[in-house]
Amino acid sequence: YEKFAQMLLNGGKCGDARILSRKAVDLISHNIITAEQAKTFNWDSCIGYGYGGLMRTLINPEITTVGSTGEYGWDGWTGNYFCNDPENNLTFMYFIQVCGGNGIRPLRTLKQVMYSALDD
C-alpha cells in the first residue's frame, strides 16, 4: 500500500517504472465535482473535500480540522484510511478492521499530531 501511495505522489512512477500516466494520476487526485454536487458530499470524513475520479480531494482546508489543499485519498467501510499530501510530500495511512469503527475522531487526532510534527 505504501508503494502505491508513493507511486501516486511520484506522478505515476514507481522507481524507474511508469505504472500510471500523469494524466491518470491527475484525474483521480483532483476534484471534478461541481459546487452543487459537493453539497451532497457531506459525510463527516468528507467535510471540506471534493471528489476526483476515485478519491476525495481537499478543496477547503479552512472547514476541516487539518490538511493541505490538494490532499487526496480514500477510506473504507472497515475503518481503513489513506491520504497523500503532495504539498508536504507525505502519506498518512491508518488501518483497522472494524465495521463501523470509531469514525473520524481518532483519524483527526492522529492527523493533527502528524501535521504538528512538520517543520515549517
Locations of regions flagged by a protein language model:
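Catalytic loop of the DD-peptidase/beta-lactamase superfamily, centered on the K-T-G motif
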Residues: 1-120
